[in-house]
Amino acid sequence: SRKMDSISRQVAKLQGYVYEQLEIDENGTARVILPQEVLQAYQLTDADTAAIVGAPGRIEEVGLWAIFVEQPEGHYRVRMRSKVIPINGIAKNHHGGGHPLASGANAFSKEEIEQIYTEMKELVKK
């Protein structure tokens, strides 16, 4: 059945926000930050963001991406994905880990968000 592919209207709106706000550099490294107020506006939680993690990857130019989801406690859960280049090394450097093309990490400041995005961009330049 097609039910498997369906998402709630709220998640669809969040996906729209992701596409609207997605920042993509010249080498196809992308990121978006989902603040608590955005999640609250759509009445969603961190768990609901799992459904939209793959969204940036549907864009041709995007090769790797991170979605930074602000938690109620203030830090950010980082959902990282890549089409080719392994990213789990970066995840390990930032309180996380996972598979080569699908990893998770945590960022405890705006600076760490920048650091993670910079490390991802460096991966592509190599």
Pin down the residues of each PLM region.
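Hydrophobic helix-and-loop "lid/oligomerization" segment in the mid-to-C-terminal part
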Residues: S1-K126
